[in-house]
Amino acid sequence: MLKRSLLFLTVLLLLFSFSSITNEVSASSSFDKGKYKKGDDASYFEPTGPYLMVNVTGVDGKGNELLSPHYVEFPIKPGTTLTKEKIEYYVEWALDATAYKEFRVVELDPSAKIEVTYYDKNKKKEETKSFPITEKGFVVPDLSEHIKNPGFNLITKVVIEKK
């Protein structure tokens, strides 16, 4: 009887220990790791491939600061066109991350542009390319031969108003 009880308890403990391992594995595999690269912090994942980093300051028509949201990174693909309308859409998402549905974009600063800095392997020096924000837009260049995760940066003031 004692042997049977010990065997039963051993089997029961093994079942519980394997079920906790199985649950952790299934939970960790549900996150699509192919789209993100793990950074230094375990809770931080940055996009793999090119991304648009939106770092804006929301001002009213007189230039008074209304909102200064944290920067937000959006994955983009080489060959796609970034128009003024699309960029305003990304800016509104960045505003919503801080104040959800409270503000709308009126206009971007006329001098606003998107910049990317990378080490050009052919010229053997650091390059910075600037792209103006226009209605027609610009095509995102493929910089994969120079850099794995090129960050296209939009850092500007944006005129916003309450919705």
Curated annotation (Swiss-Prot):
Q: What is its main location?
A: secreted
Q: Quick one: signal sequence residues?
A: 1-27
Q: Per the UniProt record, which residue ranges are transmembrane?
A: none
- Asked if Iron is a keyword of the record, the answer is no
Gene Ontology biological process terms in this record: symbiont-mediated activation of host plasminogen; symbiont-mediated suppression of host complement activation by activation of host proteases
Q: Which domain of life is it from?
A: Viruses
- UniProt keywords, alphabetically: Pharmaceutical, Plasminogen activation, Secreted, Signal
GO CC terms of this entry: extracellular region
Q: In which compartments does the protein localize?
A: Secreted
Purpose: Potent plasminogen activator that converts plasminogen into plasmin. It forms a 1:1 complex with plasmin, which in turn activates other plasminogen molecules.
What protein family is recorded? Belongs to the staphylokinase family.
Q: Would you tell me the protein name for this molecule?
A: Staphylokinase
Gene it is expressed from: sak
